[in-house]
Design a protein with these regions (language model features):
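Generic N-terminal leader/processing signal
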Residues: 1-3, 29, 45, 193
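N-terminal single-pass transmembrane signal-anchor helix
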Residues: 3-34
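Juxtamembrane interface helices immediately C-terminal to a transmembrane segment
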Residues: 25, 34-45
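Short, well-structured segments within or immediately adjacent to enzyme catalytic domains
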Residues: 40-272
Length: 272
């Protein structure tokens, strides 16, 4: 009876080389497919949050929900100290996931969006604190400060929008952004420097999250959501921390010709 010959060394090396080539070709495609899937989930989250933010206002005589993260969990709600869309966790720096979830459940928007997954981008895996510690956040999104939030320094510091009717062309104004606060949870509200503030009109402001590398999702005041692919490498560098310290807001060099910054400024809702 004849014996079957096994693979020669050269044949085995050829097979290994072919497998290596296939892996090198397929891995980027698999990574891209996974990223597209998480981007779509995140976009769906912002669609849910934005549409329910809108419904909250419609159910409350046009008054929009508070865009701050206030007060701290356990603080009684009063007329002068109303609850906002989410509250503040009991631990300020690096709160546990259960603490963050409780802060979400105590917020005003929870009765409209009782799905904890809707508050979390699947690409939001970890955050690096200013001391290098790894923190884990749950709430991946923030409301802009001018929408009944904590305001924003400069020209629109005390010009908060409290009624839905004050938002002109809501389909052009965003409400929710992706943010990655260095404290492990998104404290307060988010803001960008508007063009009406001459001394700061070429500066970004608060950083956005870099969950999707060169893209970010936005939730808009008419209830829709969209993806923005950043056009400038400098924008991606800023979002990834090249020009901003984790403890400093707006610590970045001016950028006089940046279409991404103009996009953020044009979509930022405020009263001039």
């Amino acid at each position: 009876m004849s014996r079957r010959k096994g693979f020669t060394l050269i044949e085995l090396l050829i097979v290994v080389a072919i497998i290596a080539v296939l892996v090198s070709v397929l891995l980027p495609a698999l990574r891209a497919a996974r990223e597209n899937a998480t981007l779509a989930v995140c976009l769906g989250n912002l669609k849910v949050l934005s549409s329910n933010w809108l419904w909250y206002a419609e159910d409350n005589k046009g008054k929009i929900v508070g865009g701050h993260t206030w007060p701290t969990v356990g603080t009684p709600e009063t007329k002068d100290n109303p609850y906002h869309w989410v509250l503040r966790p009991t631990t300020n720096i690096g709160p546990s996931i259960p603490e963050q979830e409780e802060a979400i459940e105590r917020g005003k928007l929870w009765s409209y969006v009782k799905n904890m997954e809707a508050y979390h981008c699947p690409s939001d895996r970890e955050r690096v604190a200013s001391n290098g510690a790894i923190l884990y956040g749950w709430g991946s999104y923030s409301i802009v400060g001018t929408l009944n939030g904590e305001g924003w320094p400069g020209c629109c510091a005390n010009k908060k929008i409290r009624k839905l009717s004050a938002i002109k062309y809501p389909e052009t104004k965003y409400v929710f952004v992706e943010e990655a606060d260095w404290r492990g949870w998104n404290m307060g509200s988010w803001g960008v420097h508007v063009r009406e503030c001459p001394s700061m009109s070429d500066y970004f402001g608060d950083r956005l999250a870099a969950w999707h590398v060169d893209k970010c999702d936005f939730g808009w005041a008419d209830g829709h959501a969209s993806v923005r692919k950043w056009q400038k490498d400098r924008t991606v560098d800023f979002i990834n921390g090249e020009y901003a310290d984790y403890n400093v807001v707006a610590f970045t060099a001016p950028d006089t010709d940046n279409a991404d910054l103009r996009f953020l400024q044009q979509g930022f809702p405020y009263i001039p």
